[in-house]
Amino acid sequence: MKLTAKLKKAIMAHADECYPHECCGVIVEKQYIPCRNVSAQSDQFEIHPEDLAMAEDQGEILAYVHSHPDGTTRASELDLIQIELHQKPWVICSYPDLDFQVYEPCGYRAPLVGRNYIHHYQDCYALVRDFYDRELGIKLPDFERKDGWWEDKDHPSILIDNFPKAGFYEVDTPQYGDMLICRVPRTEHPNHCIIWLGDNAMLKSEDTEPCIGNTLILHQLHGRKSIREIYGPQWSTRTVKILRHRDVKNN
């Protein structure tokens, strides 16, 4: 996508208006449509649903736009994920050091081992979904979840309530690919899921360093990178369910 001088001027004006917060908007019919940013995070953006709906009524969205206050035009990891999810160009404007960069969908995907933590997009369940997709060829549904949901006793127990809907059933002994649900640490609801690798540490979808053991797991703790490690007492004592997907036997 080529940015015209008119588009750049409109985006710069919106970035200036929203500074020090991120501005956001969309490009429709070669026009920049500014939108409200309703994200609770100062370094992120979320387009107001009403603004997005109004923009879509005006025509096809050609690109999504946001600014990086006091930053560069380099796409963050979350930006790269969102570009692939939306399958649309992503325009980033740095401010006040004005610069523009357009990113096209390129097939980016975070590694299974060593990915950074981003709630919902790269958390423990997102890792399970990606593992099942890449390693087992199984598509798992996603579930809306806010950070810290497990601390609210009145909140639905997302992992426990939804595993049957995702095609899982309970078993007694884990085998390769099973999902284990854990409680970390003391919480109102079980809040962590891990993947049982057993003695099969190597992945088909990416190159990884050797990892030795016969009770290996793959998981991602809150705020940490995803890792493979031994399933020791620190995890066995926290495991509340061992789950197998109904389609695993066909893989």
Region roles according to the model:
Residues 118-135:
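Active-site nucleophilic cysteine motif
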Residues 95-97, 207-208, 222, 246:
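Eukaryotic regulatory protein-protein interaction regions
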Residues 147-225:
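...with weaker cross-activation on analogous glycine-rich loops/strands in unrelated enzymes
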Residues 1-63, 69-107:
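Conserved beta-strand-loop surface patch within small alpha/beta domains used
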Residues 222-251:
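Glycine- and charge-enriched low-complexity intrinsically disordered segments
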